[in-house]
C-alpha cells in the first residue's frame, strides 16, 4: 500500500536524518501511521525521482465515483505534502493553508513541499536538472479568466505574448516559435506542435496544459505532462486523476508569483495550489531560477557579442517595452540595428509586425519565400 511502501519509509528516513524534527507520541493515528508531533521542517523540497510511483489508485473495477470530491485516488506527491495535516482519512482533498501565501508560512503549517524529476525517459528527466503563449479553450469561464490574467502579467513584463481565443489547441497558423512560457487548455492529448517530434520549446520553458489526466502516466507520450518534460520544460504541472478545475493549480496565481513577485517556479507552484492530499504534481528542479540572468544582463551579453539562437527573443522583449513608452516605430528601429547580426528569423518577423502595412508585407514575403520558414516546425507559425 501507499502508506507501507512509500510514505512511512520516506517519513522515517527524513526524521532519522533530521530533515524533519518530530516527537513520537506513541501509538498510531487514525490512519494507522506512527503518531508524530512535528516541530520543525529543515528542508525546502522533497524531490522524488524517476521510479517513485506518482499516483495512488483505488479505482479497480469501479465504474464511477459517487462523490467526486471524496475519493482515495490522489498523487503520491500531494499526499506526502499533507502528511502532518489533520485528516480523518485519505479520501478527498484538504485545503492548502499555504495557498496564496508567499513567504515561509508553509513551514509553520508543517507542510512538505514536494517536487519531482520524472519524464518519459531517464534522459528527459535529467534535462529537468522569452516568449509566452496562452491557449484558451472557452471550456469553462474560470479557466479562461486565469489565462487572461496570466497573459496580462506576461505582457506587462515585455514577453511577446500570443493569446489564442479559439476553443481548439493552437494550430499551425498560429505563431509558436521558441515558447518560453505556455499555459493552455483543454485537450485530452498533446497535439499540433506538441505532437511534432522535431519541435521543441525554448530551453527551461515554464508552463503546462490544464487537463484532468495530464499526468495519468509519466512514461507515455500521449499525456501532456511527460511531453512538456521531453520538450525542454523546466517547470510543469500535472494531474494524476480528475482534480476538478476549482482544485487545480491556479495559473494566474502562479504567473503573478513567478513574473511579478519574482519567486522561483517551485515556490510559486506551491503557493498556487488550493488543495493537498489531491491529484496534483509539480515536475521540475526546485532550485531552477528563471530570474538568475535578468533582461538587462541578457542585453549586456548581446552587446558584448555573446549571442545564441534565443538572443533575438531578449531583444524582442526589450522592443515590446520600448513600444509601450515610445511607440512601434521606435521599437522597430531598435530591432533593425540587430538584423543580420545574430539568428534573427523571429526578430525580422517582429519588425514586420511593428512596421507600417507596406513594409510589413515586404518583410513577411521575404521571410516566407527567402527563408522557407513553412518547412521549419520551429517557425512554421510565422508563415
Model features per residue range: what roles?
Residues 336-342, 367-376:
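Solenoid-like repeat scaffolds
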Residues 356-363:
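Alpha-helical linker/edge segments of TPR/alpha-solenoid repeat scaffolds
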Residues 343-346, 364:
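Mixed-charge, low-complexity intrinsically disordered regions
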Residues 1-336, 341-344, 358:
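Cysteine-dependent hydrolase recognition
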Residues 333, 363-366:
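Primarily a tetratricopeptide repeat
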Residues 313, 346, 377-381:
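Start-of-helix register in tetratricopeptide repeats
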Residues 317, 349-350, 354, 381-383:
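"A position-specific structural signal for the A-helix of alpha-solenoid helical repeats
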Amino acid at each position: 500500500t501507499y502508506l507501507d511502501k512509500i510514505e512511512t519509509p520516506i517519513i522515517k528516513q527524513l526524521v532519522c536524518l533530521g530533515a524533519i524534527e518530530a516527537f513520537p507520541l506513541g501509538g498510531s493515528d487514525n490512519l494507522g501511521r506512527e503518531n508524530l508531533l512535528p516541530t520543525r521542517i529543515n528542508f525546502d523540497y522533497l524531490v522524488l525521482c524517476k521510479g517513485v510511483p506518482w499516483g495512488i489508485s483505488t479505482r479497480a473495477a469501479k465504474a464511477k465515483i459517487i462523490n467526486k470530491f471524496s475519493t482515495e485516488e490522489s498523487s503520491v506527491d500531494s499526499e506526502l505534502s499533507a502528511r502532518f495535516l489533520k485528516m480523518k482519512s485519505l479520501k478527498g482533498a484538504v485545503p492548502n493553508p499555504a495557498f496564496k501565501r508567499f513567504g515561509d508560512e508553509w513551514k509553520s503549517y508543517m507542510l512538505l513541499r514536494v517536487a519531482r524529476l520524472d519524464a518519459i525517459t531517464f534522459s528527459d528527466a535529467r534535462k529537468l536538472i522569452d516568449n509566452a503563449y496562452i491557449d484558451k479553450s472557452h471550456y469553462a469561464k474560470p479557466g479562461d479568466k486565469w489565462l487572461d490574467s496570466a497573459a496580462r502579467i506576461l505582457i506587462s513584463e515585455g514577453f511577446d505574448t500570443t493569446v489564442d481565443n479559439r476553443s481548439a489547441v493552437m494550430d499551425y497558423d498560429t505563431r509558436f516559435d521558441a515558447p518560453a512560457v505556455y499555459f493552455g487548455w483543454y485537450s485530452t492529448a498533446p497535439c499540433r506542435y506538441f505532437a511534432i517530434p522535431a519541435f521543441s520549446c525554448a530551453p527551461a520553458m515554464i508552463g503546462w496544459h490544464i487537463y484532468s489526466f495530464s499526468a495519468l502516466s509519466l512514461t507515455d507520450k500521449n499525456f501532456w505532462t511527460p511531453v512538456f518534460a521531453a520538450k525542454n520544460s523546466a517547470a510543469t504541472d500535472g494531474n494524476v486523476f480528475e482534480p476538478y478545475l476549482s482544485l487545480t493549480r491556479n495559473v494566474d496565481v502562479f504567473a503573478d508569483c513567478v513574473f511579478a513577485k519574482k519567486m522561483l517556479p517551485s515556490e510559486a507552484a506551491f503557493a498556487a495550489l488550493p488543495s493537498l492530499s489531491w491529484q496534483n504534481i509539480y515536475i521540475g528542479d526546485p532550485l531552477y531560477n528563471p530570474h538568475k540572468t535578468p533582461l538587462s544582463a541578457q542585453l549586456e551579453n548581446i552587446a558584448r557579442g555573446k549571442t545564441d539562437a534565443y538572443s533575438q527573443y531578449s531583444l524582442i522583449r526589450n522592443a515590446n517595452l520600448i513600444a509601450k513608452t515610445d511607440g512601434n516605430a521606435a521599437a522597430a528601429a531598435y530591432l533593425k540595428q540587430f538584423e543580420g547580426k545574430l539568428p534573427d528569423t523571429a526578430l525580422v518577423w517582429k519588425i514586420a509586425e511593428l512596421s507600417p502595412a507596406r513594409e510589413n508585407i515586404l518583410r513577411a514575403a521575404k521571410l516566407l519565400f527567402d527563408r522557407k520558414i513553412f518547412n521549419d516546425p520551429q517557425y512554421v507559425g510565422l508563415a
